[in-house]
From Swiss-Prot:
This is Small ribosomal subunit protein bS20. Binds directly to 16S ribosomal RNA. Belongs to the bacterial ribosomal protein bS20 family. Pfam families: Ribosomal_S20p. The keyword rRNA-binding applies. Gene3D superfamilies: Ribosomal protein S20. Keywords: Ribonucleoprotein, Ribosomal protein, RNA-binding, rRNA-binding. The lineage of its organism: Bacteria, Pseudomonadati, Pseudomonadota, Gammaproteobacteria, Pasteurellales. It comes from Mannheimia succiniciproducens (strain KCTC 0769BP / MBEL55E). The gene is rpsT. The keyword Disulfide bond does not apply.
């Protein structure tokens, strides 16, 4: 239910809700990939961390290119995680 009375405003409300749900799903998926890298680093598994990082990098870059997150946030995630992976023996 929306408060909109004008037809175009009602349509925009429906579209906004649909995109909000889609974006929430995409953000959740991105966070899951990031957590996988952190988990591998915490376990000390360098090979697993590197493999998870490659997958995470694809997802984060795609989210940044679509405007879901800022490009700088994507860069911060990647640089922080690659530094932690390099610290592993």
């Amino acid at each position: 239910m929306t408060l909109a009375n004008i037809k175009s405003a009602k349509k925009r409300a429906v579209q906004s809700e649909k995109s909000r749900q889609h974006n929430a799903s995409q953000r959740s998926m991105m966070r899951t990939y990031i957590k996988k890298v952190y988990a591998a680093v915490a376990a000390g598994e360098k090979a697993a961390a590197q493999a998870a990082f490659v997958e995470m990098q694809k997802v984060v870059d795609r989210m940044a290119s679509k405007g879901l997150i800022h490009a700088n946030k994507a860069a911060n995630h990647k640089s922080k995680l690659v530094a932690q992976i390099k610290k592993l023996a």
